[in-house]
């Protein structure tokens, strides 16, 4: 586990490279509020921010481990399909960390692959033209970690605007306490919760 000082140094290093707080939060798997808090050196003051750092490097360094997680995600998707009687046409991976999982889930379930890149500053993201389109498709959205759900909400909105129907969101880990976003069910392998504190 990284210390707060190490996180501060890494956040500052990324900021000095020109990354926005949103981009830094994605890279460090922290909420934007936590990144802002770190960069303002508020952690030097009394009290602590309420956030949890999620790191999954032990999974990400080997494709065999990623496919094991993708198999669990596929099982969750099938469970939801059976429980809620819906079909799936496509699997969408949110860049960058959702793409490896979505690619393998797409392969395991024999579904089309959609790649979506959220924009760190604007509301609308971009769908990669090298992969499947969303129009007329029932879509499962996959990402690694959701802190506030903002990226997932924007993805749901953009899929809908492009004529697709988001049917499920699947995450490796969720810091959110909600079970759906914009009416779309959210399932995660791991759900974190901060208990106690001030």
Curated annotation (Swiss-Prot):
GO biological process: pyrimidine nucleobase biosynthetic process; regulation of gene expression; UMP biosynthetic process
GO molecular function per UniProt: DNA binding; orotate phosphoribosyltransferase activity
InterPro entries tied to this protein: GfcR-like, PRibTrfase_dom, PRTase-like
Pfam families found in the cross-reference section: Pribosyltran
Keywords attached to this entry: DNA-binding, Transcription, Transcription regulation
Family: Belongs to the purine/pyrimidine phosphoribosyltransferase family. GfcR subfamily.
Annotated HAMAP family: GfcR (MF_01214)
Domain notes per entry: Contains an N-terminal DNA-binding winged helix-turn-helix domain and a C-terminal regulatory domain (or effector binding domain) resembling phosphoribosyltransferase (PRT) domain.
Database matches in PANTHER family: OROTATE PHOSPHORIBOSYLTRANSFERASE, PYRE-LIKE PROTEIN
Xref: NCBIfam families: PRK02277.1
Record's protein name: Transcriptional regulator GfcR
Gene: gfcR
């Amino acid at each position: 586990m990284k210390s707060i000082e190490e996180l501060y140094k890494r956040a500052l290093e990324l900021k000095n490279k020109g990354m926005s707080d949103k981009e830094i939060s994605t890279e460090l798997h922290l909420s934007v509020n936590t990144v802002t808090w770190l960069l303002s050196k508020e952690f030097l003051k009394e009290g602590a921010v309420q956030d949890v750092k999620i790191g999954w490097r032990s999974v990400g360094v080997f494709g065999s481990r990623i496919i094991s997680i993708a198999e669990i995600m596929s099982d969750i998707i099938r469970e939801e399909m059976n429980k809620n009687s819906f079909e799936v046409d496509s699997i969408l991976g949110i860049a960058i960390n959702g793409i490896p999982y979505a690619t393998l889930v797409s392969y395991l379930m024999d579904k089309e692959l959609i790649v979506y890149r959220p924009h760190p500053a604007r509301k609308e993201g971009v769908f990669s033209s090298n992969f499947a389109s969303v129009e007329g498709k029932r879509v499962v959205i996959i990402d690694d970690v959701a802190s506030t759900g903002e990226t997932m909400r924007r993805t749901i909105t953009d899929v809908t605007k492009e004529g697709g129907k988001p049917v499920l969101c699947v995450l490796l880990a969720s810091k959110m306490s909600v079970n759906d976003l914009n009416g779309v069910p959210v399932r995660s392998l791991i759900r974190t919760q901060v208990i106690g504190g001030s």
